[in-house]
């Protein structure tokens, strides 16, 4: 007689779903700020060694919105960086950062409700969220001094666009031989699939195409200097993106 088969263990039984909203709020947010890449330079240490650094204009940022578990299902703090002229922003964008009169707001006021606290600042060009329990109030200003004492950061930016590139530049392939029968196809891809089966190029095959304009994160970058007077942050090494590109800076959670 065959033994009875044990029921498979459900994956969801291993997850503790009994956490309340108060328990979730206890998760603190990692330090972070928005900025703009200024460029690269080098500084000299006391022993004479030259260190390549990237200069980032970090802040000041305004807290535009606070996301809560009760209302939004998760906790986050929305930051905005770099003012944008109001004439270039739609009514929804202007109403996100400042109180403006509308039919909806009038009805809410008549019913005794409110649209919540507004930061009362200029619209922002670069807006991003930082997950976790908020450490500031709506409308407050976040400066580069928030990174004082931080040794390493993760910098996220958008890589430079290279247009339509070949497979050698895009995927770092070696190409074909320079001599011995190779003619006019030195930088070509060569064979991409078999003829009889599968008789086609499989999906996901590396080849030529659009290269760049990707979200890239450089992790565990050493903080060389924090200039609170000029809102500048100097990190060791190169940061993804062109000069003037927006970046996200977070305190790294990588060990070692």
Residue ranges and their predicted role:
Residues 12, 16-256:
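Extended basic (Lys/Arg/His-rich) segments that typically form rRNA-contacting surfaces
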Residues 5-9, 13:
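Cationic, low-complexity basic patches in intrinsically disordered or flexible, solvent-exposed regions
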